[in-house]
Amino acid sequence: MKELNVLHVGGYSSTNIGNAFYNLGIRHVLKSLPQKINLYETSDKQVYAWSRYNSTSASHFDPCEHFTDMDYIIWSGPMMGKQYVREWGPVLEKAEMMGTKVICLSAGGNQYTNEEVEEVRKLLSKFHLYALFSRDSETYESYRDLFEHSYNGICCAFYIPEYFQSWELDMEPYVVFIFVQYRGPCFVD
């Protein structure tokens, strides 16, 4: 059985720790497959990380545009948000030209508006896309017809219990934290 070369383009974890949860889940899923996979990992475009600081000098170098010898590119996270998908045309064109299959795994949108879906569909419909494993039903319903194979999946962060070894803490059994700047919902008093 041929070894597969797979490029996983995950979310940038330094500015959004939540991205690490699905990135690690995807790594776990791929390592659990019976076929030997050479997994290469990178994060989405770094200009996103710096855009919050209004940086115009952020690096626009994208290693994804220079890949060679990849059997699959795996796209994950909210990559079907219109602000993200606009940037991926050159990578999708190169994948199509090189015969590299594109998989959207643990993938979703961002705002889920009609405008976003229309814009994303307009770009994605130009390409032959291999597989969609959505992280939510809205994404599945919006894009399932654009892929050769489509599955109404879950976010790969749900696989954390399969690979993360926890330790006992001297705390209540359920403690919830959020990592954003706004106040989260109160689940318990």
Predicted regions and their residues:
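Active-site anion-handling motifs in enzyme catalytic cores
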Residues: 1-189
